[in-house]
Amino acid sequence: APLVMGVVLILGFLLLIALRDKHGQSTLARTATRFGWANTRARRKNIYRSGPLGRADWGTMQLPGLAAASRLVEYKDSYNRPFAMIHVPSTGDFTIVIGSEPDGSSLVDREQVDIWVAEWGMWLANVADEPGLEAVSVTIETAPDTGLRLQRMIQNGIVDDAPQFAKELLTEIQGSYPSGAAVVRAYIALTFNAAARSGGRKRSADEMGRELASRVPGLTLGLSSTGAGAVHPLSAQELCEVIRVAYDPAAAVLIDEANAAGEPPELYWPEVGPTAHQATWDSYRHDSATSVTWMMSTAPRGNVPSSILARLLAPHRDIARKRVTLLYRPIDAARAAAIVEADVRNATFNLSSADRPSARSIASTRAAVATAAEEASGAGLVNFGMLITATVTDRSREQDARAAIDNLSATARLRVRLVHGSQDSAFAAALPLGLVLPKHLQVPAEVRGQL
């Protein structure tokens, strides 16, 4: 009887690992997620209160969760431009954030778009060789435009002796354009490790600041040729504004009004977090908004044109603020060769073991062989993922936002799923904070991948 019971338990355990849903997640992994969420709720770790009436003794509105221990310092690069550097002591990572406002591909020749795509691939390949680089994230954010920037530009451009018709026309544009307009911004976060190489000496924040100051100009110069528009490193003030508005969208108008008046608000890193948040199984309530975050479970198959994410990245009327974050983790050359060769062996075995191989098996084998050939010729290999965050300021619009993301992800040929039980962490990971998620896991990423 004990032997039979042991065999049954082993078979049951193997069955929990073998059974997987359409997203490739096993029954065991889903069960572990449920137990983890139940433990989080029982310990009330999904609720956060800050400020003078909060639970923390120091009374500030510091960032919650994964970014709670982060620190912000500011340095100047070789061009004397201030840039912010985020330090996460628990992981020993340092992050700089580059901001841009891309022009998009409208009214742009196809040849120019192809050049931008090629330059972006070259930039990713070059940045992967940067010493100590851990990860790169690209966040494209769409939000309602307050119109204050346009108003300030028009007012500064009107002269006293201008024709009356021109003044009236500009006044009309000033009042009508902001209605329904949206602003699109992009942020590139580059995360470096304190140790330049594995087993090397860990450098201090001051040493990293001085070193990155000499590397920032080269990184921004390379981005200028990728279609990113005018790029510049974010200062500490600018980064504080971005994170503050992400957690409290209602503050966007106040911050824009202060900047338009020439009196930018003085924000500090311990004050940019939410005053309150509450994470649920499939949503995240923070200050004046509610957000839902999805993760990519399957990338687009087949040929991927440059416009495949166009509709997903574009503003949507049912979503107040939307962030699409691409996460890249470069793989060193030694591991990359072994990975692509293993993929070729697996694909070839699957193809040869079937009497009538499917079209997908044939395509997978061709793709694996092509990837191995490109890697052998010097191309880099990266792990990549995607997070999509939809934020609404009216909770009655939450279901509309969910439906919109489902439709938009389908047009991009993406398979996405809700981040269950970790909405607060996923929200922070989608921000330009440079968080390297595998370093924050209690269970090693290699073990989780097998489950």
Language model features: what each stretch is:
Residues 2-451:
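Extended, folded cores of ATP/NTP-driven motor/assembly subunits in large transport
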